[in-house]
From Swiss-Prot:
Protein known as: Probable thiol:disulfide interchange protein DsbC
Disulfide feature: C174-C177, C213-C236
Keywords, ordered alphabetically: Disulfide bond, Periplasm, Redox-active center, Signal
GO cellular component: periplasmic space
Region (Disordered): 33-74
Cross-referenced CDD domains: DsbA_DsbC_DsbG (cd03020)
Amino acid sequence: MSGPPFSGAGMNFRITVWCAAAAVWSSGALAQDGAGQAAPGTPDKVYSTTGTAPAKPGDKVYSTRSAQAPDPQADAVKERFAQRFEGFDVTAVRRTPYGLFEVQIGTDLLYTDEKVTWVMEGPLIDALTRRDVTRERQEKLSSVPFDELPLDLAVKQVKGDGSRVMAVFEDPNCGYCKQLHRTLEDMDNITVYTFLYPILSPDSTTKVRDIWCASDPAKVWKDWMVRGQRPPTAECDAPVEQWLALGRQLMVRGTPAIFFKSGGRVSGALPRDELEARL
């Protein structure tokens, strides 16, 4: 999948951990230490992870914060984490049944002890069942009720009886999105809702406008993504800002981002067998 670098996890987090460790060491504590296309730059934080700040009046907000009972100890860990690592937007901290605290930063997860002396970047594996606990938690935290998606803002394509449904955030300049379309060409009885998501280049915004404003957006979209036929120029009031706001609210950091009827989501172009299994 492609997406802008996320400052809360991965290599950027590890670098920050080591920088913070040098400062924390003097006070007696040491801190130690995710297939798509990346959008340039870090996304502006217009979205909300708490469900309280719509991008603009009337917008529906999707939250990645699950309801939980008050936990003073977890709150204290969150405060300590913020002190250790300034600039990280911590969504929530939760106590786990395996003696650690789960630190949620958007849809990314880290683990720490009560005093935030050590920080571990997943995945966390259950040694008895071999389950990837981190991945399971991320899927749960990032799930979105499919019926709540504003499908009227999507380009709709139907093949066969259209009984299997999915929604995808795509940039017209995304190579992995085009790979996904080649996979979909070999599948039947499917409905695909595409949210045009121009994050890769200024030219992406022009293309999504031409596609959305065409007399047959679904045909023009397929012609471009599958056949490479550039969309003819078209003018209308395309909902570009609404697409971008929706993506931020859902924490879509790259394309393609696939949402399934079950509420699950996947980042990147899945091979056909995995896609069939999820549909």
